[in-house]
Amino acid sequence: MPIVNDMKQETLFSFKDTVEADSSKADRWPTVVAHWDGKAASRIQFEDKEAHIGGRGELNPMQFVLAAFAACDVDLVAMHATMIGLHVNSLSVEASGHFNVESYIGLENKPGSGYDQISYKVILDAPDATSDQIAYLIERCEQSSPIGDTLARNVSMTFEFN
């Protein structure tokens, strides 16, 4: 199988076949640790990877939520375009949202401080795309985005404070 969009189709289809045979192979349970780095800065660790959120010159946590969502859909569209053999010249996702920080700064009896609205736009340059391929990619964005799905549902959360 060929390489499309710098990805090996064979690798993608092989993983898909593996998951079809055993759905537990699709399970993920990542744990990240955020460390305070002074002022409003955090250093995030996941295994041997590190990212910085907040502080001078970095995305703040709420911007990072949008960034993670946009990046997730870039990955999703690129992967599915590859699987259907569609060459992508360029791809970007623009995400924006509204939130209010009254509750975050400690004002009482105010609505939650999370996003209450998010909009996003996929900008795809794939001159050979058919209308069926575009419809398929739109469907994947609407139904298969892990972060989009997370944002759209009530997620069970547990909390400890030590």
Language model features: what each stretch is:
Residues 68-73:
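Alpha-helical metal-binding/catalytic segments enriched in His/Glu/Asp
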Residues 1-67, 79-162:
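Extended beta-strand/beta-hairpin segments
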